[in-house]
Amino acid sequence: MTRTLLAAASTVALLALGACGNDQSAGNQTARAGIWAAGSSTVFPFATRVAENDARTSGGAAPRVESLGTGGGIQAFCQGVGPNTPDIANASRRMKASEFELCRTNGVTDIVEIKIGFDGLVIATDRNAPDYGFSGDDLYLALAKEIPGPDGTFIANPNTTWSQVNPGLPATRIQVYGPPPTSGTRDSWLELAMAPSAEAIPALAALAESDEDRFETLAHTLREDGAWVDSGENDNAIVQTLTRTPGSTGVFGYSFLEQNNNLVKAHSVNGVMPTLETIASGEYPISRSMFIYVKKQHVGVTPGLEQFVMEFMSDASAGRGGYLQDRGLVPLPAADLAAQQAAARAMTVMTAPTE
């Protein structure tokens, strides 16, 4: 299956949803021909694989899966109830409190949160590049827009090579291709990579305690001078860019590393390489959970929605050795998977997020 919406079309789609998708009464819905899931580019290959299997076993229409980024998918999901809005939002982070409130405002009051597994964010290069070992404050000093200067004040980041950041790193130009602001992968990168790297600097660790807002601004604001390059929602495009631009670096989900390990290689963070085992255990520091959000008000209206969700969470799909592990999904521990399967069967409605 292909990515069914181009990035340029997503704004038009959302405007259309705002105009005609906010039929908030489940009783007034008309059934759509098939299931519609939209959101994270990282969850996209997992959702498309489940969609293919679901269509094959059910004999029905293949579910429509769109890669809009986590933020774009949740935005579309929260536009209302009815056939002009997605049944499922795919997300590489938890839904935010502000997004949950948008859903409620537009009549999407019954949302089921299901954790499907884990993913790690990898820092990768083409296979012929030298080995990097990132640690401590390396990522912050390379990619933050402002860093502490010699006198302790914050200055525009002057570092142009990795060896200027850390003499133990290669003397290659800092040029990192990564996810845009609409992506859940970007949110995860800022929280799991940039913020801890900033806290490795004593002055910033102190600032995190005394002025959290200022700390977050400094830790989460990436360079705009070409050292960091927003590369759209297609992680495969980043992989292709790395093969065409030797010396550059990319940030994307572990599943894309698994699919392209003949073209690119990952590098360690704090001495730990990303693997299924280190991501599942949390030993690899840039690890995260992935989710699907189901619009319960569409259950019983969109044909096959419950069946699709249960296929997604089945042992054969999301379990250890399941077909999604072949795509790079890091499975949940057995007990956690059983709990998520129970939530999916019961369609347990989530409570409001706190953040």
Question: What positions do the PLM features span?
Answer:
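Bacterial N-terminal signal peptides that target proteins for export
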Residues: 1-9
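Low-complexity, intrinsically disordered short peptide segments enriched in small/polar/basic residues
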Residues: 9-11, 32
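Flexible loop/hinge segments at secondary-structure junctions
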Residues: 20-355
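Bacterial Sec-type N-terminal signal peptides, specifically the leucine/valine-rich hydrophobic h-region
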Residues: 14-17
